[in-house]
Amino acid sequence: MRALLVAGVVALALVVLAPASAAKKGGCPAPWNAGWQKLANKVDAPVYCPTWMPNPLDAKIGGDYQDIYSIGKDHSFLVSFLELGDLGSGDVHVNFRGYPGHTAIPRCPAPVGHGKVPCFSEPVGRMSANGIHATVYQVNQGADQWHIALAWHYDRSLYIVSEHVIAPYRFTTQIKRNLGRLLTSLVLVKPAG
C-alpha cells in the first residue's frame, strides 16, 4: 500500500512540475530554438516547437533527451524525446511528426500479417488550444504505438504530437492532460528565407 501511495505522489509530482527550461509564451525557448529552426529549414515547412515538455524532458534537438531525428525524402519528419526510467520507474516518451504537403493519415505496415493500416486510428475526441483543433487518436503504429496522439492540419500539412502511455504517466487522463499542455505550448517556427 505504501509503495502504491509513493508511486501516486511521484506521478502527481511529475504531472504538476514543469521542467526548468520551459519558456514564456511567444517563441521557441532559446536553448531549443536553433534545432527547431534548422528542422524547419531542412523540411522547408513550418514546424511546431513546444515551450513545455513533460518532466523530465526538454525539447532540445541534439540534446540529452533526443531519441530519434529522422527526415524522409518527402520532407516528412519524426523528432522523438525519451527518458528511460531506472529500475522499472517507467519512461517518458514524446514524438513530434510532420508531413509537409500531405494531409492524409499515413499508412504503416500491419502489426500482424500483411498489408497496411492507418498509422493513427480510432479517434476518441478532439482537443483545441492555441488556434489548433486536433483529433485525439488512441490506436497508433510504429514509433507511436502505445501512445495517445493529437493530429491536426496547418498550411496543407499534417502535424502530430504523441506521448507514450506508460509509468510514470500510466493513465490516459494524465497523458491527455500532458498533451493538452503541449498543445497550448506549441509555437510555429517557419523556415528562414
Locate the predicted segments by residue.
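Hydrophobic alpha-helical transmembrane segments of integral membrane proteins
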Residues: 15-16, 46
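Surface-exposed amphipathic alpha-helical segments
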Residues: 155-193
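Short, solvent-exposed recognition patches
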Residues: 25-157
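Sec/Tat signal peptide C-region and signal peptidase I cleavage site
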Residues: 19-23
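Bacterial N-terminal signal peptides
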Residues: 7-15
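Bacterial N-terminal signal peptides that target proteins for export
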Residues: 1-6
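Polybasic, lysine/arginine-rich low-complexity segments
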Residues: 24-25, 177
